[in-house]
Amino acid sequence: QLMHAGAIASNDRKAFLFPAQSGSGKSTTTCTLFEEGYHYLGDDYILVDTDRNIVYKLYGTTKMEWDNLESRFPHLLSATINSQVRPNQKGILYLGAQNSSIISNTIHAVIVPILGSSDSGFSRSTVPNSIMAVAPTTLHHLPHHRNESYKKIKKLLSKTPNFIWRLPKDKKHIIQQFHTFQNESI
């Protein structure tokens, strides 16, 4: 099943999905964790086997607003593959080659990132909340079989732990909170 979400994996091959609408912190989260040494599976589109709970790297790309790239990831600006369209489109970076040997991992949690909250941290979430984070964009971009795709997405989210992550403002705290979450919650 094609899915609009971010995904990273730890060295012990546990994958974490980050489904979210544009502008919610999905790219910031996946790129920050990639820089910390997590394996990058994708941030725009990924492929998910909903029967086996496995996520596959598809394109290995990320799309990010130029101002976010400049402020949080200035060292990645030179890696954009579409700098000629600036500022009319998001910057596109190909991060997939950095860890091309890691192409699939078992999904251990679905984490919906939220930017702009005064309190940061993780909390348990519901399947409907996660569905609302992934289904609208994913289904909108699919030309056919939307009802079947919706059922597959719901099936995956129903058998996977769901969380909300109110993101801290700085990268250091994103990393600290994720390490704590990974070590204590799963």
Predicted regions and their residues:
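N-terminal pre-Walker A segment at the start of P-loop NTPase domains
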Residues: Q1-L2
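Glycine-rich, often acidic-flanked micro-motifs
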Residues: G6, S10-Q21, E35-I186
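Conserved glycine(s) of the Walker
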Residues: S24-K26
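Post-Walker A alpha-helix
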Residues: T29-T30
